[in-house]
Amino acid sequence: MAPLAPRARLRHAARGGRSGYNAAMPIRYTPSELDQPSLSEADGIRYLHFGTEWVQGAMLIRDPARLVLEYTAQMMAWLLFLEPPREQSIGLLGLGAGSLARFCLKHTRSPVTVVEWNPQVTAVCQMFFRLPTPQRLDVHHDDAGAWVADPARAGDCPVLMVDLYDAQARGPVRDSVKFYRDCRRVLGEVGVLSVNLFGRHESYGRNIDNLSKAFDDRLVLLPEIDAGNQIVLAFSGPPLAITPAELLARAETVEAQYGLPARRWARALTRHAVDGVLHF
C-alpha cells in the first residue's frame, strides 16, 4: 500500500463490489473477495487500486521487474542480512501488483510463496501486471493470519514480507501480537520479517509494540520515506553483531547485484552503532 496515485482516471479491472464498513464501529477489517481491483496509468506506470485512489501497487510498463515504489525497494532490505534461500521460500503476505514477486523471481533462484486473499487480485496481476507463472511461484488464496497460524508452515520462509492493506488504507489488516508471533514461527530458526507500515497512521504505534513483543525488541526501522511509508525489519535467530564497515561492505554487494539503493539503507542503520558495533 502506498499513497495516492497521480491524478488519472480509474478503470475497473474485474467485476465485484466493495466490502461493507461502518467507520463508527470499532471493528477489524475482514478480507473480502468483493474488494474490486481497478487500474490507472500515468507517465508509463500502471497502478493497482481497490476502487479508490490509494495505490496498492505499481509497475513500470517498459521494465516490469523494476521496483517503482520506494517502499517496495526498502522491503528488500533483508538482503543486507540474509542471502536469498535456495530450498525454502521467500514469503509474501499480500500480492498487490506483484512487484516484489516479479523482482524476486527475476533476481533470485528462490521459490516464492504468496498469500493473497482475493483471487481477483491474482487474476488482474496475471492479465495486466505481467505476473510470471513459473513452477517456483506458489500462490495461496487464503487469509494471511490463518496461513501463518498453521503449525505446518513453521520454518517455511526465512524471509517474509508483509504488506497487508485494504481499500480503506486504515493500517495493516493483520497486526496482532499473535499474528506477528505466528510470522516468527514461519521464519524458523533464522529469518527476517519485513513489514510495511504508515509512520503517520494511528496504527503505527500499535504495530511497533506488537512487533516488539513478538520479536523480543529485535527491530530495525528504516527511515520513513516522503510518502509516509516506514519499513520495519524484525529478526529471528541468534543475536547478530557486526561493524558498520561490514554492513556497508554487504550493502555494496547488494547494490551491485540487485540494483537496490542498499548503501543508503546501510548508512542510515550505521547511526545506531554502539561502541562501533551494530546489534540486530
Give the ranges of each region predicted by the language model.
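C-terminal substrate-binding/active-site "lid" region of AdoMet-derived donor-dependent transferases
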Residues: 177-241
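Short, solvent-exposed secondary-structure boundary motifs
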Residues: 20-33, 210-214
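Extreme N-terminal basic, low-complexity initiation segments
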Residues: 1-10
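A short, flexible beta-alpha/helix-coil linker loop
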Residues: 53-57, 165-168, 193
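The AdoMet/dcAdoMet-binding core of the Class I SAM-like
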Residues: 30, 42-43, 48, 63-185, ...
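Short, positively charged and aromatic/hydrophobic N-terminal segments
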Residues: 9-12, 18-21
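SAM/dcSAM-binding transferase cores
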Residues: 25-41, 55-62, 69-70, 81, ...
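A generic structural signal for alpha->beta connector loops
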Residues: 36, 109-111, 134-136, 190, ...
